[in-house]
A protein has these predicted regions:
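Positively charged n-region of N-terminal signal peptides that target proteins for export
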Residues: 1-4
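Sec-dependent N-terminal signal peptides
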Residues: 6-11, 125
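C-terminal motif of bacterial Sec signal peptides marking the signal peptidase cleavage site
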Residues: 14-17
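Heptad-repeat coiled-coil amphipathic alpha-helices that mediate oligomerization/assembly
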Residues: 19-21
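Active-site-proximal mixed secondary-structure blocks
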Residues: 23-202
Length: 202
């Protein structure tokens, strides 16, 4: 059951918002008239869980430097308690964003209506240039200084609780061994972050 909760996915949750606020978070209406806080736990109770069905953008850093990438693996559920909503994301050590995830305590995941955003973010590396600027995205920050993009449809802010640096010894069958065979970016690190803020565009 714990595994099911942790790796349950994001689609229905992200599609639904609630008016009441039960977890401490910034009111992004101070920064944008179109992003409104919603209650993640209440959305859990109304919708249950489903698998990831679309790509999302992961961003980490602070007000001086940050980077974002496309993610297709992950989930949302409860971790270390029934009332502690959490997000699970996977970042390979060869990715530029991995350096930010290792250094900074918080990150955001975002949903966009325009698929060209996650297509570009997944194709190019931040080592070679400012991807947000190339896409015309505007960086903003939560009250904790966590970066996100003003144009996002959904923004979820997380504080990392657990980072699991997988090795081949962690694999229990041949599926991950076969998948990672020849994968140059390396075996993904699994990050589990407590959700400390969630906003959606009205």
């Amino acid at each position: 059951m714990k595994k099911q909760l942790i790796f349950a996915a994001l689609a229905l949750l992200l599609a639904t918002g609630c008016n009441q606020q039960k977890i401490e978070q910034t009111n992004m209406n101070k920064e944008s008239n179109e992003l409104t806080a919603f209650d993640v736990q209440e959305a859990f109770e109304k919708n249950g869980f489903t698998w990831f069905t679309e790509n999302l953008i992961l961003c980490s850093g602070d007000t001086t430097r940050n980077n974002a990438m496309t993610i297709g693996w992950g989930g949302i559920g409860n971790y270390l308690g029934h009332n502690r909503p959490a997000v699970t994301v996977y970042v390979a050590p060869g990715r530029y964003t991995w350096e930010f995830m290792e250094k900074y305590p918080r990150f955001t995941i975002m949903q966009f209506d325009d698929p060209s955003i996650w297509q570009y973010m997944g194709k190019y590396s931040g080592r070679d240039g400012d991807k947000a600027a190339a896409l015309g995205l505007h960086v903003a920050y939560t009250e904790h200084g966590t970066p996100y993009y003003e144009e996002a449809k959904i923004v979820i802010e997380c504080e990392t609780m657990t980072a699991w640096h997988q090795t081949e010894q962690d694999f229990r069958n041949d599926t991950p061994k076969q998948w990672y065979d020849g994968f140059e970016p390396g075996i993904h690190t699994i990050y589990i972050g407590e959700i400390i803020g969630a906003w959606k565009r009205q």
